Amino acid sequence: MNKQRVTLNCDMGESFGNWKMGSDELVMPWVDMANIACGFHASDPSVMSKTVALAKHYKVKIGAHPGYQDLVGFGRRSIPHTPAQISEIVLYQVGALKAVCQYHDVPLHYVKPHGALYNDMMESEAIFRAICEAVSIFGIPLMILATSDNQRYLDIADIYDVPLLFEAFADRQYQEDGKLTPRSQANAVYHQPEDIYNQALQIATYGSVNTANGTRLSLEADTICVHGDNPESITLVQRISQAIAKM
């Protein structure tokens, strides 16, 4: 069993102009960490500022959520970049959110890449190194996917003096190697509240998930990613938060 209570993190600040995404005001009181979009895959300066202020109000730790420059595709399309360009887009976005945090007199606690950039980071050592290099400038941890081989990533991040936070997903199906089932495949995302609730509690209590073929996979995760995109999911986040608080 996990010795330390896992935290809950959620993607936030993903509205853009007149386009509304998520229910940040209703979810924020129930999570520990807010992954705030930085303007490339979603968000804008006003949304970033409002979301930072909301996180400050509820004493939620703030993380930068950089992605590929792809508003139309919501950052879920992989866009070819050189390692140097990866470092530059991460520096640009994290630097912007850090400035917003300074304006609101709150610290920036960590970085968690978004969507396709997150997936590419987990698949490509060159991209992972490029992101570590950028994050090292800020002296804060990088959040990545907990897998069956956390040590591999720890060894690389240590070269850049970047601490790692490992996360697991409450609403995603896992493969035997600890990677997430691609969204292009059936059953990659869980939609039934009880399935999501049960997986979250299994991670929090036993540090494990059941994979696509039914085997149990151990995951050393510090935090669980949840989503609050609709009224039903907001209620679910509340249930998960209350259950973990009792552990």
UniProtKB/Swiss-Prot annotation:
One of its GO terms (biological process) is carbohydrate metabolic process. Signal peptide: none annotated. GO terms for molecular function: 5-oxoprolinase (ATP-hydrolyzing) activity; ATP binding. It catalyses: 5-oxo-L-proline + ATP + 2 H2O = L-glutamate + ADP + phosphate + H(+). Its EC number is 3.5.2.9. It is an enzyme of class 3 (hydrolase). It comes from the Bacteria. Keywords: ATP-binding, Hydrolase, Nucleotide-binding. InterPro entries: Glyco_hydro/deAcase_b/a-brl, LamB/YcsF/PxpA-like. The keyword Lipoprotein does not apply. Disulfide bonds: none annotated. Forms a complex composed of PxpA, PxpB and PxpC. Belongs to the LamB/PxpA family. Catalyzes the cleavage of 5-oxoproline to form L-glutamate coupled to the hydrolysis of ATP to ADP and inorganic phosphate. HAMAP family: PxpA. NCBIfam families: PRK05406.1-3, PRK05406.1-5. This is 5-oxoprolinase subunit A. It comes from Vibrio vulnificus (strain YJ016). The gene is pxpA.
